[in-house]
Amino acid sequence: MSFTIAIIGRPNVGKSTLFNRLVGQKLALVDDEPGVTRDRREGQARLGDLDFTVIDTAGLDEGPRGSLTARMQEQTEAAIAAADALMFVFDARAGLTPTDRSFADFARRADKPVVLVANKSEGRHGDAGALESYALGLGDPVGVSAEHDEGMSDLYDALRSVMPEPAEEVDEEEIVEPDMSRPIRVAIVGRPNAGKSTVINYLLSEERLLTSPEAGTTRDSISVELNWKGRDFRIFDTAGLRRRSRIEAKLEKLSVADTLRAVRFAEAVVLMMDAQNRFEEQDLRIADLIEREGRALVIAVNKWDLMKGGSARIASLRNDVDHWLPQIRGAPVVAISGLTGEGIDRLMIAIQTAYAVWNRRVATALLNRWFQQAVAASPPPAVSGRRLKLNYATQTKARPPSFVVFCSRADAVPESYLRYLVNSLRETFDLAGTPIRITLREKANPFAHKRKRKS
């Protein structure tokens, strides 16, 4: 029997748009007016290799008994009862409303797995609403734009976590690698005139993108599809990123915003540098942006054909990356020439490797064996004479690898100790160059309320 997921939420948050996106057809009417959907509608959805039944529901809204609104809610309740899991959708741009909070309680009472979806997350305006949603207690929000087909890979990860595992068992002693048959979305970014378009033209074997010695030739984020040695890629060429103080024209500001969106919705990002220029603060800012967005990073040093004594230059760049960007220590640095093709094969291999690391999941038994050894080798410092207890760790998601450490006092664990855990994780499981997220969470103390009563 097919796994069934009901899409729920208040009116006009984009449930029907998401439904249409998942089923691949415009089966549900979509309009800006709230309440267009009245009956529940079922469809067969496919996302990556996930096949499931999805139910579109009316917006959860209360009304008098017997009214149309009340009957719409009954239809929604029937869909929830029939579902194996729920997708709770809210509008990230509008933020949480009292109705969202009310029906988040409703979703919790259903006692079914819930995937929290922050729809309309395109651009920067959805960030605040997404962060606000942590207060609902329904887990990490998945930022998507159903209308623009953005964030679907993150939604895939979230749905995969609540759906039954395939019949084939994974050896718990193995590190789980991703399915490499899907196209890799790659954004190529960097300062103006680093040769981004020239590299893509070489890969395509045609003058697909305009190139010029003049900086700023590329304005839009242009996407192209290519197959390299049997592997599919979707590559986004982007406008060069200059320091904010140098950006004056409105068109350039729009180009920069377009580039930032390309980074946000890419899976791997190539930071292109000109070999003739020094590693500058703007390169660091771009790399830091890529890390904050949680994307796999490869650094490509272009125009290598113009350089002499190159091996020392590459070694120096690698040292600079590890020194200035310890949060992505070990990011691959590849020397290339978009004009002659030198190093292009190495670049494509580095992208695939970085993508695989970014997707990596570590088996729980293997993870906790590392965790016990890491804590035993270097226990966390005591705070005010009290020992901090770190209980266990679990991986919550990949893309990038994200972990939760359960402990006695989350607020007392110093940042330096978190960096120690990140570096140890990176070294033990060969996670070089990918962002690693560690969140601290306190284990509930069953006796806390009793102590409060006595005081």
Curated annotation (Swiss-Prot):
A single GO BP: ribosome biogenesis
CDD domains found in the cross-reference section: EngA1 (cd01894), EngA2 (cd01895)
Domain EngA-type G: 3-167, 184-359
Key word Oxidoreductase present: no
InterPro entries: G_ENGA, GTP-bd, GTPase_Der, KH_dom-like, KH_dom-like_a/b, P-loop_NTPase, Small_GTP-bd
Ligand binding (GTP 1): 9-16, 56-60, 119-122
Keywords noted in UniProt: GTP-binding, Nucleotide-binding, Repeat, Ribosome biogenesis
Alphabetized GO MF terms: GTP binding
Pfam families for the chain: KH_dom-like, MMR_HSR1
Residues given in the record as GTP 2 binding sites: 190-197, 237-241, 302-305
Residue ranges occupied by any KH-like domain in the UniProt entry: 360-444
Keyword GTP-binding belongs to the record: yes
PANTHER family: GTPASE DER (PTHR43834:SF6)
Complexes and interactors: Associates with the 50S ribosomal subunit.
Primary role: GTPase that plays an essential role in the late steps of ribosome biogenesis.
Family indicated by similarity: Belongs to the TRAFAC class TrmE-Era-EngA-EngB-Septin-like GTPase superfamily. EngA (Der) GTPase family.
Protein name as annotated: GTPase Der
Gene: der
